[in-house]
Amino acid sequence: VEAVATSDLVGLRIKTVRRQRGLSQAQLAHPELSDSYISLIESGKRTPTPSVLELLAQKLDCSLSYLLNGVTAEQMRDLELALGYADLALENGEAFEARVRFVELLADSNLTGLTALRQSAEFGLARAHEACGEQKEAIVIFRRLQGEQLSDEQQIELAKSLCRLYRVSGRLTESVEVAESTLASRSAWSDAYVELGATLLAAYWERGDLLRARQFVAELLDAAEALGSPRALVAANWNAAYTARRTGHGGEALNFAEKALAVQVENGPSRFSGAMHVTVANLYLRLRPEQTSRAIEFLERAMQIFSESPATAFEQANARLERSRAEIMSGRLDTAISFAEEGLTLLPDSAQILATEAHLLKSRAYGLQNHAEEAARELSLARDVLFTMEKADIAVEYWFAAAETSELLGDSDGAVDAYQKALAAAGL
């Protein structure tokens, strides 16, 4: 037990329990302590050492937890159990259930004096908000935690979360600043700092600072190799793959991604390994279309992983949409439509991007089957989603995809309109 900080509350609890037990200060003190020492502790003028607090808890027949925090050992166990269940729900992909549990925990008055436990619950609630697509709410909580005293690991985790949340919210300057300022304070690289650096890379891509991204990824890879830990190697190589892809180095991208996946698989299962298999499959489909069968192998493995370990509906839907793409490329159009429909069924209403992709895949498959009416219907549904999409940079990509699908269906007017929408979304 670390040295206990001087606290009026600790002294008040000792005084309250002593009186409840019908003891005088002298009776509580005898024979190990002086009554004047007890008086100083109760008035908050003296900080009791850990050993003294343990002694007083024994003599008062109460828990050390109560003297320290104002909650009994049983109440502390209940709080820790509630936190564990909330964390487990979040880990299992049950974001809405986790959010409810964290909110209920933070409403418990017994949590008030338990700073570390409260901070853990607030971190959890912020992560749950993010998993529910509620970025603004998550940012508010993390910003509030910025003003508190946190461990080094928590400071890095907070910076990583804010960097990611600012990025997906389009606040790119803040995304870069929060990560760069935290990285600047490091004395040496660690796994956590490499992961923060990997998150910063994504902000560089979004900002269009690809030269800085290429320079920084080299530094990040060197740091990961020097550390030699699986955690650092996966983070650095995985994000190096994205950087290589964004800068037009497709071969490098696939090599980095496969290296990251190999390290991840070698060091045991992870809930992220399924999503990693899907991404590697996507790279094969886009960069090496002649190896579609290889991509399907990765997708089959991903679906197996998702069936054996927790996965979000988003992750499972994404795997099915990539499988639909692979089946279209292989000419198995009925199977492609089936996988796209499965993906759509799994998607939450907020998943605009994947919903657009699903409708475009179905439209393309129907078009290749010469089912013009069904193809046009799916294309129309994709366009409806695109009209509501807030992120212009992503809308550009999908308007171009809609234009290509319109051309496939022989709808030249629709293709021209979609190209114009793409240019407008790009600000041209």
Positions of PLM-derived features:
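Tandem amphipathic alpha-helical repeat scaffolds
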Residues: 81-92, 117-133, 156-171, 194-209, ...
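Short alpha-helical DNA-recognition segment
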Residues: 19-40
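DNA major-groove recognition helix of helix-turn-helix/homeodomain DNA-binding modules
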Residues: 51-66
